[in-house]
A protein has these predicted regions:
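Short, charged/polar N-terminal "headpieces" of proteins
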Residues: 1-18
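Generic structural hydrophobic/aromatic packing signal, biased to beta-strands
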Residues: 6-8, 22, 38, 80
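Short, flexible N-terminal segments of the mature chain
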Residues: 17-44
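Acidic, low-complexity intrinsically disordered segments
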Residues: 37-87
Length: 87
């Protein structure tokens, strides 16, 4: 399965910048829904952070997904790859 990778940066209330990728099926292009996926992920964290906007969440590229990402997408409609300051 090919997935679209949305590169995302979010300002945390403690001053740190979260960096994570939102992965969705490559044919999925509903930007508002992708932002909703990211906001759902951010709201699951124990710290406060800003809401996602199109300025901080941008399409980056398409890649082939590993099995774990395919499983996440099958269950949730999306997958998150944590990069920096996500915990």
């Amino acid at each position: 399965m090919n997935v679209s990778v949305w590169d995302t940066y979010v300002q945390r209330k403690d001053g740190k910048i979260m960096h994570f990728d939102i992965l969705v099926p490559s044919q999925f292009n509903d930007e508002q829904r992708i932002l909703d996926f990211g906001n759902s992920y951010v709201s699951s964290k124990t710290f406060e952070a800003s809401k996602l906007t199109t300025e901080i969440c941008n399409f980056c590229h398409i890649e082939s997904a590993p099995e774990s990402v395919i499983d996440d997408i099958s269950k949730n409609g999306y997958s998150i790859i944590e990069m920096e300051n996500c915990n």
